[in-house]
């Protein structure tokens, strides 16, 4: 592992260094992947080039090279994709950049050289250099009428005893100007929001639009699976109020507390399918934490896994994430397919990376998805936003929650 030192600083300083390096890589013609925030014990993980390719879910995050860093995603609906980085740059708490991966230290490895150049540039310019600006997107207003109908349908299903709660999603749409590069726009869109909102975790994957693999720019605050060897945690989010309201309101809300506890039970069930007997535990219940534009209720469930359980097997047992489906899970998934007018795509799936025995995935919420329209050839940008529905939900209240969650994505930074 190689190192290149720089001074330590605030969270904003770390973010600035990471986003400046990401912008430099894109400007130089690379296809980088980035994890910014708290990932794998570092403040940022950057790869200069990751060629994402479609793969079967059973092969996701697998590689014959035990030292490989694998970036990828599993969509809620659609085909999984991943790609291997020959080396990565890791930003530590003390402000030191570390290099890791099979190509580290190889002077003839172009990815290692690209990372060195981008980090040198970032160290020298991050405090003074403005990030590239993304052309403003003209988002539609979302299908409020259909969403509110789905809320009513869900409440009827709850009253009939079919489900206890579900997570209903809606999608917002925009189109990229013909003159814009999709990768450059996505990188600028992502970096500007990471710089402004300082999310705890954010993820960027370069995609391959010509192969039908989307570019993903995610501000998701929700950890799906965090695995270190045989230990795993899942931290579902359920319960939301706008950021301008007192956070303790969440703990006084019967609806939000009930949402969270029901999903915690579902997470315990999911992990219990593959965990060692007796090891599934709720280690944190109903913590109030901030996220861009909102306050959320978080809970954490931990477990111990068998030694030989693969990353793909763990994901399969817990997918789709509990918080974006409902209880009971299978019936909720069936009903959501009927109620939602569009497939979710990457929204509500999983995004992140794996390295050896470590796996870190976020739930792909608060995520912009760049795809190519097969008919017009234009690049579409979509953002899915969802929320938990219980018997205490109202259509108007749920749409207000959608708007609060969507604002950091849809409003110009």
Identify the function of each model-found stretch.
Residues 1-413:
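Extended alpha-helical targeting/anchoring segments
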């Amino acid at each position: 592992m190689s190192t290149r030192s720089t001074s330590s600083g605030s969270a904003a300083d770390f973010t600035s260094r990471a986003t400046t390096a990401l912008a430099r890589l894109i400007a130089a013609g690379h296809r980088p992947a980035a994890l910014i925030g708290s990932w794998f014990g570092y403040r940022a993980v950057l790869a200069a080039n990751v060629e994402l390719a479609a793969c079967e879910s059973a092969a996701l995050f697998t590689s014959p090279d035990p030292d490989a860093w694998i970036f990828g995603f599993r969509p809620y609906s659609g085909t999984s994709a991943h790609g291997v980085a020959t080396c990565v740059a890791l930003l530590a708490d003390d402000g030191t950049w570390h290099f890791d991966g099979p190509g580290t230290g190889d002077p003839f490895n172009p990815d290692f050289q690209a990372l060195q150049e981008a980090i040198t540039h970032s160290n020298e310019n991050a405090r003074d250099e403005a990030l590239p600006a993304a052309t403003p997107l003209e988002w539609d207003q979302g299908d409020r009428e259909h969403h509110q109908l789905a809320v009513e349908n869900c409440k009827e299903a709850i009253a009939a005893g079919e489900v206890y709660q579900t997570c209903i999603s809606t999608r917002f749409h925009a189109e990229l100007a013909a003159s814009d590069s999709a990768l450059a726009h996505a990188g600028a869109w992502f970096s500007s929001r990471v710089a402004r909102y300082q999310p705890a975790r954010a993820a960027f994957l370069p995609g391959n639009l010509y192969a039908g693999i989307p570019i993903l720019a995610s501000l998701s605050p929700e950890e799906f699976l965090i695995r270190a060897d045989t230990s795993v945690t899942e931290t579902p989010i359920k319960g939301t109020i706008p950021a301008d309201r007192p956070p303790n309101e969440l703990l006084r809300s019967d609806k939000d507390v009930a949402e969270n506890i029901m999903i915690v039970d579902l997470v315990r069930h999911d992990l219990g399918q593959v965990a060692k007997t007796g090891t599934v535990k709720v280690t944190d219940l109903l913590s109030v934490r901030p996220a861009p534009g909102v306050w959320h209720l978080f809970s954490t469930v931990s477990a111990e896994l068998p030694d030989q359980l693969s990353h793909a097997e763990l994901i399969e047992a817990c997918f789709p994430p509990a918080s974006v489906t409902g209880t009971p899970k299978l019936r909720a998934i069936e009903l959501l397919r009927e109620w939602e007018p569009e497939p979710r795509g990457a929204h509500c799936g999983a995004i992140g990376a794996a390295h050896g025995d470590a796996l870190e995935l976020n739930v792909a919420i608060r995520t912009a998805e760049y795809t190519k329209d097969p008919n017009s050839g234009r690049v579409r940008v979509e953002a899915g936003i969802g929320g938990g529905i219980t018997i205490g939900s109202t259509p108007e209240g749920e749409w207000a929650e959608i708007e609060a969650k969507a604002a950091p994505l849809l409003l110009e930074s």
